[in-house]
Amino acid sequence: MPELPEVEVTRRGIEPFVAGRRVERVDVRTAMLRWPVPAGLAEQLRAREVLAVERRGKYLLFEVDAGWFIVHLGMTGTLRVLPAAGVPVAAKHDHIDWIFDEFVLRFRDPRRFGAVLWHAREAGDVHAHPLLASLGVEPFSPAFTGALLHARTRGRTVSVKQALLAGDMVVGVGNIYASESLFRAGIRPTTAAGKVSLPRYERLADAVRATLADAIERGGSTLRDFVGSNGESGYFQLDCFVYDRAGLPCRVCGTPIRQIVQGQRSTYFCPTCQR
């Protein structure tokens, strides 16, 4: 599933193409995604100029004068920028095209768990949309601190890794990035969230930011389907300290990496480096 780094890589790849350009038309070939594509979306966007592309959590917010169209990549979704001249014929899983003058923005989603939605400007701030309003803070914002994590986890018995994944404290820390961040912070993923001290949460906040920044720099992680807007795979997964390295020696101390299951998801950690 594309997480924050993959969505941010997509945003950075798309925005230089679409910002300041007008949508000539929208071709919706499959309206039944995770939620139905709004029936009037194509007409609503015709001849509209894209003003900006923002990311909130794992959602992409494309602003036009009348509102925002919101895209979520789901588990297998991608957005590709394709030259209008000689654009490939849409394949089975190519569900939506936004046609501009010189290129096509194509949404592909084999499993159809993604979404394309509309938020009209008269409905108010897009960040108040029901899917966005309850999201945690952005990891690169000043609001994301060790003190925030410490305060929000007092009395909680859930594991620190599961608390990170929940998304109500901080957005975008998916499974691979939670394991990697906890390794960098030296925190064992099974530790109860409420038992982690403030200094250790301060290290964890720094580790989350560093891990996500490194992943973005490397084009995200391609475990199955993800490619960026230019069709290239990410390669962060090649440099992981612990993720998907069960039985291999820790890159720091040489201890074999362990794999366990938490909340039906695989967790990887070093039993020596993480306490």
From Swiss-Prot:
Alphabetical list of Pfam families matching this protein: Fapy_DNA_glyco, H2TH, zf-FPG_IleRS
ZnF (FPG-type) ranges: 241-275
Biological processes per GO annotation: base-excision repair
GO molecular function: 8-oxo-7,8-dihydroguanine DNA N-glycosylase activity; class I DNA-(apurinic or apyrimidinic site) endonuclease activity; damaged DNA binding; zinc ion binding
Reactions accelerated catalytically: Hydrolysis of DNA containing ring-opened 7-methylguanine residues, releasing 2,6-diamino-4-hydroxy-5-(N-methyl)formamidopyrimidine; 2'-deoxyribonucleotide-(2'-deoxyribose 5'-phosphate)-2'-deoxyribonucleotide-DNA = a 3'-end 2'-deoxyribonucleotide-(2,3-dehydro-2,3-deoxyribose 5'-phosphate)-DNA + a 5'-end 5'-phospho-2'-deoxyribonucleoside-DNA + H(+)
InterPro entries membership: DNA_glyclase/AP_lyase_DNA-bd, DNA_glyclase_Znf_dom_DNA_BS, Formamido-pyr_DNA_Glyclase, FPG_cat, MutM-like_N-ter, Ribosomal_uS13-like_H2TH, Znf_DNA_glyclase/AP_lyase, Znf_FPG/IleRS
Cofactor note: Binds 1 zinc ion per subunit.
Origin superkingdom: Bacteria
Keyword DNA-binding assigned: yes
Binding site for DNA: H93, R111, R156
Keyword Zinc attached: yes
UniProt entry keywords in alphabetical sequence: DNA damage, DNA repair, DNA-binding, Glycosidase, Hydrolase, Lyase, Metal-binding, Multifunctional enzyme, Zinc, Zinc-finger
Gene3D superfamilies hit by this protein: 1.10.8.50, MutM-like, N-terminal
The protein's required cofactors: Zn(2+)
EC numbers, comma separated: 3.2.2.23, 4.2.99.18
Active site (catalytic residues): P2, E3, K58, R265
Known partners and oligomeric status: Monomer.
NCBIfam families: fpg, PRK01103.1
Family: Belongs to the FPG family.
Function noted in UniProt: Involved in base excision repair of DNA damaged by oxidation or by mutagenic agents. Acts as a DNA glycosylase that recognizes and removes damaged bases. Has a preference for oxidized purines, such as 7,8-dihydro-8-oxoguanine (8-oxoG). Has AP (apurinic/apyrimidinic) lyase activity and introduces nicks in the DNA strand. Cleaves the DNA backbone by beta-delta elimination to generate a single-strand break at the site of the removed base with both 3'- and 5'-phosphates.
Name of the protein this chain belongs to: Formamidopyrimidine-DNA glycosylase
